[in-house]
């Protein structure tokens, strides 16, 4: 079924708003079919777990998926907030992608510069993340790799039209670049 039960409107600024509706009803059979598809993944495949979990699903869903796939050599990317992100660290995700505000929320601090991002990204690595990519809106991004490399990138010049999907695009670009070159640069 695709019934919508609630809507949430977020006014982010004078230029942008966000409207979220609750997703469809998800049954145990739907979850079983998801796991059947996940079982088709092979070593070195990339799985991206992104966004929030519908209320009708267990809040441990990302963690459950990672536990289910553990030891199979699948590169799992997690782009989520707070507990959805921190709960998966024990399963050593290939990449996590918080933004600087989400990173600060995890540690109860305000993060405003790239040096702070690096400091707290390394703390997430100590908890299990292999690579940490942190987006910083107009201030660019930081990548801290499992090899100890630190990359700082500036945001592209230009006029922002709409930031919706920017983080998702960053994850997609990283995954594409990594798969193409097998390098973090």
Locations of the language-model features?
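Short beta-strand segments
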Residues: 10-12, 20, 49-50, 79, ...
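Conserved phosphate-binding/catalytic loop of the ribokinase/pfkB sugar-kinase fold
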Residues: 10-43
């Amino acid at each position: 079924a695709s019934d919508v039960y609630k809507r949430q409107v977020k006014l982010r600024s004078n230029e942008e708003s966000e409207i979220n509706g609750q997703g469809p009803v998800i049954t145990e059979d739907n979850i079983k079919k998801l796991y059947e598809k996940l079982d088709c993944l092979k070593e070195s495949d990339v799985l991206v777990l992104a966004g929030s979990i519908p209320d009708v699903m267990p809040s441990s869903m990302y963690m459950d998926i990672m536990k289910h796939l553990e030891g199979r050599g699948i590169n799992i990317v997690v782009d989520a907030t707070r507990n959805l992100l921190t709960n998966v660290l024990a399963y050593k995700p290939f990449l996590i992608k918080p933004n600087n505000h989400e990173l600060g929320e995890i540690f109860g601090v305000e993060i405003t510069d790239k040096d702070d991002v690096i400091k707290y990204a390394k703390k997430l690595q100590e908890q299990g993340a292999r690579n940490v990519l942190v987006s910083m809106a107009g201030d660019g991004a930081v990548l801290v790799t499992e090899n100890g490399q630190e990359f700082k990138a500036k945001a592209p010049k230009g006029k922002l039209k709409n930031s919706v999907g920017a983080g998702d695009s960053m994850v997609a670009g990283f995954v594409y670049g990594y798969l193409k070159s097998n390098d973090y640069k």
